[in-house]
A protein has these predicted regions:
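N-terminal secretory signal peptides and thylakoid transit peptides that target proteins
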Residues: 1-20
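Short, solvent-exposed loop/beta-turn-alpha elements that line the ligand-binding surface or hinge
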Residues: 39-45, 124-139, 203-205, 222-242, ...
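Extracytoplasmic/periplasmic solute-binding protein
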Residues: 148-156, 161, 183-232, 238, ...
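Glycine-centered hinge/linker elements that transmit conformational signals in sensory
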Residues: 189-192, 229-258, 301
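Conserved C-terminal helix/tail region of periplasmic/extracytoplasmic solute-binding proteins
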Residues: 42, 73, 78, 171, ...
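C-terminal lobe and pocket-closing loops
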Residues: 40-42, 111-114, 118, 128, ...
Length: 439
């Protein structure tokens, strides 16, 4: 757990001075002025316990910690921050929601606020303040956090996931770039396998990567878990086609993907064993920062997700919303901190620190410096705009959030691709589970 002081803030802020963003004393002075004029005044003696997902990019974590320290220095709020793996964030947030204690704020994944809508502090005032000031929210991000007209949380950012590939392997396979249709993408993966430079995508319980690529395939074929009225429609010809396509694709993969979590493909790619996968920008950053992997970094490129038979993007990107529990003793401090995070003086520096790992959800940040700092970052600037909400065409809410958290779509594909079940049984299992959720 990190307990932040002004000393750690001033000491740590110098690293980003070269970006032109406010740092050091200048940022502290701005933060203090912001706190005095903020619509939300932190309660006297406020102390916030904040859980966040464990960082994949060190510079992002550093920029976040500097922001936390600035908030503490400016408002006097004691900030205790700790990190958990992607897989552990939702269970630990659920424990806090059920017990009414342990956390004030939880920064999690996908539709986390929708899992316990009656346990969160409504954020309409924060959402309106930020939206009006910074050009409005991207559609999928807003939908992720809303129940009707109620904002259950704030979509801080999107962890964009796109195709990460070795250019040399693609070219050796006879392709100049990643094909932007499903048929061509399958041909590429077959050619990569033939050259012993395989692709690999997780079929295990990888909260970010597995949900992302398997929903992309399902939606790209026109298959969905539920329709616009939340009627379960997973048992369809479109789902059949999606499963068959995925099975063919999985036969080209590197061994072991059935047990992969969210860090497995990072490790395999950086070890030189994997040549195409879906991931955030973290693989490229890790290679770029390691002098021993200079050649790997230069050979690593990114591409948009190919478009499926329905002819339009069907991306499930990893929204990372933050929520405040309604049992917090410090609601004003909670709202103030969330608003503080997304102010330009903080947010653009934070995005630069994240180096493309985080994508903005407020339209004004389309011009943030991070997107032109490195040409390989640019693809990730599109993540919040090309995404569908995690509910697909259904209603975002607790039921859709439960289906994501329980890996129903992931397990359906994994059951068929690994041979644990045939096609019909794989769908039937998912259908039964969905009907229990949506009854």
């Amino acid at each position: 757990m990190n307990n932040f002081t002004r000393r750690t803030f001033v000491k740590g802020s110098t690293a980003l001075a070269a970006t032109g963003a406010l740092t050091g004393t200048a940022l502290f002075d701005w933060a203090k002025a912001w706190a005095q004029s903020s619509p939300w005044k932190a309660e006297k003696g406020a102390k916030l316990t904040v859980m966040r997902w464990r960082r994949f990019v060190e510079a992002e974590d550093k920029a976040f910690n500097e922001m936390v320290a600035a908030f503490k220095a400016a408002t006097g709020t004691d900030m205790n921050v700790f990190s958990e793996s992607f897989e552990d964030v939702q269970p630990k947030a659920s424990v806090a929601a059920n017990t009414g204690s342990g956390l004030d704020l939880a920064w999690g994944l996908h539709t986390l606020p929708q899992l316990f809508p009656d346990k969160v502090l409504q954020m309409n005032d924060v959402a309106d303040y930020l939206g009006k000031k910074y050009g409005g929210w991207t559609e999928a991000a807003a939908v992720t956090c809303k129940q009707g007209n109620k904002w259950l949380g704030i979509p801080v950012a999107t962890i964009g996931g796109y195709m990460t590939y070795r250019k040399s392997a693609i070219e050796k396979a006879g392709f100049k770039e990643v094909p932007q249709n499903f048929a061509g993408f399958l041909d590429l993966c077959k050619a990569l396998k033939k050259n012993n430079t395989p692709a690999g995508f997780p079929l295990g319980h990888a909260s970010g990567d597995a949900n992302a690529w398997l929903h992309w395939i399902l939606w790209g074929h026109g298959g969905y878990t539920v329709d616009k009225d939340d009627k379960v429609i997973i048992n369809s010809a479109e789902t059949d086609k999606a499963l068959e396509y995925c099975k063919a694709l999985s036969e080209t993969f590197i061994p072991g993907v059935a047990s992969w979590n969210d860090s497995s493909n990072n490790k395999a790619f950086l070890a030189g064993e994997l040549h195409l996968t879906n991931n955030g920008i973290s693989i490229y950053i890790a290679a770029k920062d390691d002098p021993a992997k200079k050649d790997l970094a230069e050979d690593t490129y990114h591409a948009l997700w190919p478009t499926g038979p329905i002819g339009k993007p069907t991306e499930l990107q990893l929204c990372v919303p933050i929520l405040a529990f309604n049992f917090t003793k410090f609601p004003n401090a909670s709202k103030a901190f969330i608003a503080f995070m997304l102010e330009k003086e903080n947010y653009e520096k934070w995005l630069s620190g994240a180096r493309g790992y985080l994508t903005h959800t407020l339209n004004a940040y389309d011009s943030a410096p991070v997107w032109t700092a490195d040409p390989k970052n640019q693809v990730f600037s599109q993540a919040s705009k090309r995404a569908l909400p995690a509910s697909g065409i259904g209603t975002p809410g607790e039921k859709a959030a439960t289906a994501i958290a329980d890996f129903l779509v992931v397990d359906m594909f994994a059951n068929y691709c690994t041979g644990r079940e045939d096609l019909k049984n794989s769908i039937a299992i998912a259908e039964r589970q969905l009907k229990r959720i949506y009854r």
